[in-house]
């Protein structure tokens, strides 16, 4: 359930679903009539024509039509005058609008017996056992009809009439057989008759009387559960499934390959088996007095097991495949809730090794091209959206190519952007700072060496995480408070964090070395610009000796020096 006000989205709430709400979501209002989206047939499509079968798992009446402005009544591409005001076909009564409804329109299966939802039986709260005051093992014993499969005498093919006559004759012997025979219906009626307010008050009174720790813990759980049910307007019998919702047809599609061969999603097979068993159970219930009662019990057990496989999969098929199950979408690291709803930062973050780059300005950080292209991919797609000829797949392929125009777009994006850098473990505030990114080659983050003390980092393989601020408030905070030039002084001891590191001292020392062993091939230069030209083209190296022309009071001198001394002299002159 989505919670929102008139202005914007507030939050998301998970709740036990009301059966009436399932009918509302799956029904269509058409010409003062309500068309309910109940799936009756286990068939999916006609494999000869490739069209969905009526009242099946891909029915166009229930899940909306497949093609745009098209029907299955052999009348294609209607004139707009043939449509009603709401664009319904007059012949087959299908809705003729763009088929986006097929991705969110639900269907449902009307179950002939109420089936217990397995998450409320074996889940961490064990809701069913708390509500019914029964043990989980005993409830499993009831819903899977183990009483009839464990006792050999009930495996005999008794008729209902004979069974009830035996119950009347031997009441002591067959005392609890009714409870085991109609366990689903009896448990469902017990939950229907629960008054939540009276149960809550009774449990609170028992809590005052009881002194045992175990009983108190159990009563606390029950009181919390009843409070939750009352506050959220949940009825206890909703933990049983009267109606089984079916996912929209657009989320479990089928694809045509060739020679009348199709690929269909595995969840459709599970739904198909549930409908088959449900229809078979309906047939046995109709012929109850004329058949053996064990047939009905087998179908009830199989129906419960198939719905369990849909929720928590334990069934392995012959080809080592498994059915789709909904617990995968909520459990684990890559579940829908953890990965997509709670972990949205995963798509806008990265990690890389840091390497030294003294030529970079202290407030900047060198961001590799391959990281920046993945971080800013949604922004680049948004820029390319103005070209309507390109689809999303082609845009993403275009971005992955190292094109000059993409680099220009990236440089424009990075001009007013800040990225947050974190080094684990985050022991204090200085481990999280923001920098202005610059596009660089290679695969590592180019880091300013004097900023290492605040992060407690060095260049022996340390890794740093990259995060991209998205919201206006986080952008403002990263620009003002977290910025690197605002965190020069430590907040704990007021010391300058720009301390001279070992790397910095070694670098200055190497730039001051004058090696007289390289006396061969000493070049003569008239200007420093020419020396830099030779140095950048790898003709001269950092320790090579050179003679440079120096004029003082119209007197010409040639000074013997090295490239490294010229570099440090130039930097000292600039700064």
Curated annotation (Swiss-Prot):
Q: What is its main location?
A: plastid
Recorded hits in InterPro entries, A to Z, give: DNA-dir_RpoC_beta_prime (IPR045867), RNA_pol_asu (IPR000722), RNA_pol_N (IPR006592), RNA_pol_Rpb1_1 (IPR007080)
Compartments annotated for it: namely: Plastid, Apicoplast
The UniProt entry's GO biological process terms, in alphabetical order, are: DNA-templated transcription
Gene Ontology cellular component list: apicoplast; DNA-directed RNA polymerase complex; mitochondrion
The region annotated as signal peptide is none
Any one Gene Ontology MF annotation carried by this entry is:
DNA binding
Which reaction equation describes what this protein catalyses? RNA(n) + a ribonucleoside 5'-triphosphate = RNA(n+1) + diphosphate
**EC number per UniProt:** 2.7.7.6
Keyword set for this entry? Apicoplast, DNA-directed RNA polymerase, Nucleotidyltransferase, Plastid, Transcription, Transferase
Which pairs are disulfide-linked?
Answer: none
EC primary class: transferase
Summary of subunit composition and partner proteins = In plastids the minimal PEP RNA polymerase catalytic core is composed of four subunits: alpha, beta, beta', and beta''. When a (nuclear-encoded) sigma factor is associated with the core the holoenzyme is formed, which can initiate transcription.
Role noted for this protein? DNA-dependent RNA polymerase catalyzes the transcription of DNA into RNA using the four ribonucleoside triphosphates as substrates.
Q: What is this protein called?
A: DNA-directed RNA polymerase subunit beta'
Q: What organism does this protein naturally occur in?
A: Plasmodium falciparum (isolate 3D7)
Q: Which gene encodes it?
A: rpoC1
